[in-house]
Design a protein with these regions (language model features):
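Extended, hydrophilic extramembrane loops/domains of integral membrane proteins
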Residues: 226-272
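Juxtamembrane interface at the cytosolic side of transmembrane helices
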Residues: 2-7, 276-321
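Hydrophobic alpha-helical segments that drive targeting, anchoring, or assembly
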Residues: 79-89, 99-106, 119, 123-124, ...
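Membrane interfacial helix motifs at helix-loop boundaries and amphipathic/re-entrant anchors
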Residues: 30-39, 262-288
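A cross-kingdom signal targeting lumenal/periplasmic-facing segments of multi-pass membrane
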Residues: 90-170
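Membrane-proximal low-complexity regions enriched in glycine and acidic/polar residues
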Residues: 140-237, 242-245
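Juxtamembrane non-transmembrane segments of integral membrane proteins
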Residues: 27-103
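Hydrophobic secretory-pathway targeting helix
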Residues: 1-40
């Protein structure tokens, strides 16, 4: 039967190895590597401006983004589905008040936020689904350790452009964690030069019977707020101006304008605040691995050290000259 000291040493070795392994896998359980959480709640982003305009008439304007996490999803990637609607007033149940509606579906890298393939875009218009190359993150930015989130400029996807636009770091606010704010400004852009859509152009006729083609033009100035530990979008503040212009870019007709910010930003931020940062996760990993290694070394020393009682019995058993 093994002596108790050997048994204890073997247990220490096992415990030490277990702690080292736990240290290696801890970041995945702590989400401290900046991955997109899969159990997010409160993922509806609603912006409402009671002083907006639609086709030149003053009216309330609501934009709503609803994000859903779907399968397939694993440690490396996640599937996202985002509904983006724009409507008059604050009740989206009335179809007649709908200005536009679209649904985006794509697969995303959980760490970097980068799309892994083209997005599938469906709209309420009588058009087949389109495939759009996103070419940049939207609802999640990379965090420190993958790519520096605090870069002065990042390319963030804009669904109205169907392309990325530069977003410049505007600040970092410490309110129950750190929220990074990026400013994204879109200069007046003729959307017909970006993609085909039913309302991107229109024909008008003047009093003399002359026809002219107008082009839907888009301008925006928005602030995007991202929680720093996860890189997840927690809030939006934007001024959006959509209008029709002639070939020279001169404004001729208003379409939609609004200035609003999302509700519930603090709740989204609070839900993410308990997730450890990457530095905290690394600290936990290092401490657990070091403690495990020390315990394993102590156990090995005890296991390999000669047993005193066995050595003494052998010494007594040896014949004397």
């Amino acid at each position: 039967m093994l002596p108790k000291s050997r048994i204890i040493s073997a247990l220490l070795v096992g415990l030490g190895v277990a702690l080292v392994v736990a240290g290696l896998v801890a970041p995945r359980f702590l989400l401290g590597d900046g991955r997109m959480p899969l159990d997010l709640e409160n993922t509806t982003y609603t912006l409402y401006d009671e002083n907006g305009t639609v086709k030149g008439d003053k009216t309330g304007v609501t934009r709503q983004l609803h994000m859903e996490i779907q399968n397939p999803a694993n440690d490396e990637m996640v599937s996202l589905r985002v509904g983006d609607t724009l409507f008059q007033g604050n009740d989206g149940s009335d179809f007649d008040s709908l200005v536009s509606a679209s649904t985006w579906s794509w697969e995303m890298d959980r760490v970097t936020g980068e799309p892994l393939d083209s997005a599938t875009l469906s709209t309420v218009m009588v058009m087949p689904p389109a495939h759009v190359e996103m070419a940049g993150p939207w609802f999640k930015l990379p965090v420190e350790g993958a790519v520096d989130t605090r870069a002065e400029q990042v390319e963030v996807f804009d669904p109205i452009l169907r392309a990325t636009a530069p977003a410049i770091l505007a600040g970092a606010d410490k309110v129950n964690g750190v929220v990074l704010t990026y400013q994204q400004m879109v200069e007046p852009t003729n959307l017909a030069t970006k993609y085909a859509a039913l309302n991107n152009t229109k024909m008008v006729t003047d009093e003399e019977g002359n026809t002219e083609q107008l082009f839907l033009t888009y301008r925006a100035d928005r602030l995007l707020h991202y929680e720093s530990n996860t890189g997840v979008l927690v809030g939006i503040q934007e001024d959006v101006d959509l209008y029709y212009a002639d070939r020279d870019g001169n404004r001729t007709e208003d379409y939609v304008t609004y200035s609003a910010q999302t509700e519930g930003d603090e709740q989204r931020q609070d839900a993410l605040a308990d997730i450890p940062s990457q530095s905290e996760s690394q600290t936990v990993t290092i401490i657990v691995m070091v403690v495990g290694a020390l315990i394993a070394v102590v156990g090995l020393i005890g296991a390999l050290r000669p047993d005193r009682r066995q050595a003494a019995s052998v010494s007594r058993a040896e014949p004397k000259d």
